[in-house]
Structure formats: C-alpha cells, structure tokens
Regions:
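Residues forming the flavin
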Residues: 6-153, 157-524
Length: 524
C-alpha cells in the first residue's frame, strides 16, 4: 500500500470509528485489554474500590474492535533518504530533543549531523554499571551524558505536565514505531522502563544513519562552532552556516559557560531541588490503594503517587516517582553527590522512591551568593549544594541519608533502613545542612503529605541528598516565533538544557518543533 492509499485508508477508518469509555474493576479491565483495542487507560484510586477507566474503540455498528484487528494504529513516519541532501542541520546532543529533531529533519529531507559528548548506549551501560559498583565516574558517560540523554537510564516515563503546543501523541507513536509496547499509545501515565529504552534509542540511531544522517559519539563541540555561527558575514543572503539545534541537556554546565563566553544569551530560571525519599513499596500500595489484596495489585501494578503542597509561598512536590524502582547516582562531575530514580519495565523492586523538591526562584539564592561564588546564581547554587552533599556523604558516591521522621523532627538517624541505592548511604543531618529555604519547606511539606496519607511520614522511609537535576537552572532565551536564540541567529536552543522542557516527552516535542522551524526556514 502506498502512502496515498494508506492516508486515505486512515481517513476512512477513523471517520467511521468511535470511542466508548468503560468503568471496570481491575479484573474486568485486564480481560478487556487482552481482547479489545484500547485507546486510553487510567486508574481511579480515589475510592476504596479501585476502578479502571478504559476507552475502547468501536465500529460504526457499536461493536468493540478486537485487539488483533488488521487496522492501523497510526500513520507510520516517512523518512527520506538524505545521503545526498543539500540541506543539513547540526544537532548538539543526542537526548530526546536531539534524536526527535533528527528524525523530524529526515521526514523533511534535511540531513542531520549529530554530535554527542557521551558514548553510544551499549558502552554507556558499561560505564553506568561501573559507577553503581563504586568503580569510578566517567564524567562524559554516566546517567546524564550519552546516547538517549538523561532519560535513558532514569525510568523512561512518557507523560508530561506540559501544556505546550504540539503533537504529543506523535511522540508516543514514534516511540512505539521504534519498539515500545502498545500500552505507550494509551496509558495515561505511560512508562517504558530503563531496561527497555536503550534498545529503542539504538533503533532510532540506526534509522538516522541508514537514511543518511550522521551521529558522532564522544565528541564535544568547542567554541569555534558558535563563533562561526555568529560571524556577521554568515547572516547575509549568501552561503550560510548550517543551523544548529542546541539540545545539550540540563547537566552540561561547561557548555553553558562556553556559550556565555561566546556571547550567547543565558539567564537564570526557576528550578527545584530537594531530596529523594524511598518507602517500602508495600506501604505505598497500602496508602494509595486502600489495602487492596495482592491479586488486585498484580492486575493494576504497583502504586505511584503525585503530591504537591504550598509552603511559605513556594511549591513542594513529588517529582519522577518510581514505583518498584531504584535510587541511582546521577552526578556528572567529581566531588558532587546527585541522586535520581529509575524503574525497570516491570516495576517490581520492593522499593518506591520519588524526588521531593522545593520550588526555587532566582531571588531565593542571590542572598547566599557569597557562599558559592559568582556567575549564574542558580547554576552556581546548584553546584555548591551538590558539593555539600558530597562532603556530608561518604567516599565512592555514598549518599548522605536520614530516616524520614528523623529529618522532620530534627535528629540524627542512629541506623538506616535497607535502601536500593547501590553505592551505599551514610547517616547525616540533612535537616541541618540543607539551606533553610529548602530544608524547612521540605519538613513542612512532609507533614502536609502525612495529613493527606496517614502513614507516609514514617521512619521506615529514608531520604537521600540531593535531588538537584529535576530541571535546568538556566534558560537560553529564544524568540517565540522562530525558536532561534535571541542573541545568536541560526541557533535553536531546545529541550531541558535550554530551559523549555522537563522530561522525555516535552523534550522530544521541543526538538520536533525546532526541526519544523528549520524546515519552514528552508521552505520544505
């Protein structure tokens, strides 16, 4: 079937199909998922009896469409061969923004040339395994840097709170096209898992190269690239420098400083920092699922949560909650301690962890600038607190830790519960050394969450410091109409590192939008 026939078939198919929403018990929903074509699925745990909301596809006669019906799930992408394309674009960073930008450029006949400072995903897995075994940090290949970006080994959640414009469903479809399971197309909180995402990222890379794009690993760009980009002669009507999509991720602090030196506009932005809290997953299941029996939990999966409160004019909230997950060392430089969370696809570890972070505005950290140096206040503050966590932890990436109730009540934990963080933990008074505008708000936030879910504030739980990379502390401002840097024409900052996204899906969407602007500029 050619593209025209496919598109006509899709149009006809979707014009005669409708959706019907069902409210089912977990067992009924499980059986329906095995038989029918599901469009959307979510869990309603507000009442004691869990309900699953399923949206099912039905035909023009009102009959439910069978799961295995030979009908298209979506229109597949149409990548062009760009081996000899005249139009090119440079992409810096092979995270979700960079990879989805590259795929979008292929769809428009533009040849992407991608530079990634880290390693390809298989070699990166080796470096991460060494890090988890206390065998050393590779500053260019870790949980932050390498093929797929930070999201590759931090859970693979495919949902976003972002309300930005764009085809978020198309992001899900591309993940599915490259190997994700069907449920990414309809789960309200879709999740791939850190064990499955690497093969999907690898498939994207192979597609880009097969169609004529380039990906260069272990390659850091230098300032000459940006110097040439901003040379006045290259702004005219003659031969111009290829456009650059800047998708560096939120941890490329050295690149931020290089950009500043080259006159690219950067500014501090609001972000969030705090700790990662870990409970027994069985306790979270009890609290969120109202003591449901294990056979019900087996049907719906381990419970997650999303918590938010306001303390002294700032948000305190959960971030990147990982049911059945692990806490991992997510730093990218020596003498710093950064933690994050991840879950494998089955989410079956005995632990539940989540970032618990406090909203930080630029004005919140300027008063303390004398403590951590000069520069971009928010960036310097972030680095300073990560170093403080290192000083209060132990050697070999051990993290400072405190039982949750001890933290809230202000005392040293004499011992610590079992924890999923492989490098190990050291008992520490986080309540004393965290800055007051973070620590005090966290303490009150945990009290608020205890009122909502009695039993949440328990010494069975442990907190680790610091959770500092939930979002970028810097923004690279861009023009809303063109998505180009306000200071540097032909430079397209995008994704988390530019301060315009937070997470895999919103970063991917931002990369798509940047690529579309380049295609528009090329009149393609």
């Amino acid at each position: 079937m050619d593209n025209v026939q496919f598109e006509q078939g899709c149009t006809l198919f979707f014009s005669i199909m409708e959706n019907v929403q069902l409210i089912l018990s977990p067992l009924e929903a499980h059986n329906a998922e095995q038989r029918y074509r599901v469009v959307k699925r979510s869990i309603d745990a507000r009442q004691r009896e869990l309900k699953v909301l399923l949206t099912i596809l039905v035909d023009e006669k009102g009959h439910k469409v069978e799961r295995e019906a030979p009908i298209p799930l979506y229109e597949p992408p149409h990548f062009q061969d760009v081996h000899h394309a005249e139009r090119t674009a440079i992409i810096i960073g092979a995270g979700p923004a960079g990879l989805f930008a590259a795929l979008t450029l292929l769809e428009h006949g533009i040849r992407p040339i991608v530079y990634e400072r880290g390693k390809e995903v298989s070699a990166r897995k080796v470096d991460i395994a060494r890090l988890n075994r206390n065998l050393g940090l590779n500053p260019e290949s870790n949980y932050c840097f390498g093929e797929g970006g930070a999201g590759t080994f931090s859970d693979g959640k495919l949902f976003s709170r972002s309300k930005k414009r764009g085809n978020m469903q198309r992001v899900m479809e591309l993940f599915h096209y490259f190997g994700a399971k069907d449920n990414v197309l309809y789960e309200a909180h879709a999740h791939i898992g850190s064990d499955k995402l690497p093969s999907i990222i690898r498939a994207m890379r192979e597609c880009i190269i097969a169609h004529g794009g380039e990906i260069h690993f272990e390659t850091c760009v230098d300032k000459s690239l940006f110097h040439n980009l901003s040379t006045p002669s290259l702004r005219g009507a003659g031969e111009s420098h290829p456009p650059i999509i800047l998708s560096i991720g939120h941890s490329a602090h050295d690149t931020y400083r290089m950009l500043l030196e080259e006159g690219v506009a950067l500014e501090p932005k609001g972000f969030a920092m705090g700790v990662r809290v870990e409970h027994p997953q069985s306790l979270i299941n009890q609290l969120m699922y109202h003591n449901q029996p294990q056979e019900v939990i087996d049907l719906v999966g381990n419970a997650s949560y999303s918590l938010v409160t306001q303390v002294q004019g700032r948000g305190v909230y959960s971030f990147c909650m990982c049911p059945g997950g692990h806490i991992v060392p997510a730093g990218s430089s020596a003498e710093s301690c950064v933690v994050n969370g991840m879950s494998a696809s089955h989410r079956n570890s005995p632990y539940a962890n989540s970032g618990m972070v406090v909203e930080i505005r630029p004005e919140d950290v300027r008063a303390e600038a004398y403590m951590y140096g000069s520069g971009i206040d928010t960036l310097e503050f972030q680095e300073w607190l990560e170093h403080e966590a290192f000083l209060h932890g132990g050697t070999d990436n051990q993290a400072p830790a405190q039982r949750l109730r001890d933290f809230v009540e202000g005392r040293l934990s004499r011992d610590l519960p079992a924890c999923s963080y492989l490098p190990g933990v050291v008992s520490s008074r986080l309540d004393e050394w965290l800055p007051a505008h973070i620590g005090l708000r966290l303490q009150q936030g945990f009290r608020d969450f205890e009122r909502k879910y009695p039993g949440f504030l328990t010494n069975e739980a442990v907190i680790l410091g610091v959770e500092s990379r939930s979002s970028s502390a810097v923004r690279i401002p861009r023009a809303p109409e063109t998505l180009q840097s306000v200071s540097t024409p032909n430079l397209y900052p995008c994704g988390e590192g530019a301060g315009y996204a937070g997470g895999i899906t919103s970063s991917a969407l931002d990369g798509i939008n940047a690529a579309l602007k380049i295609a528009e500029k090329y009149n393609l």
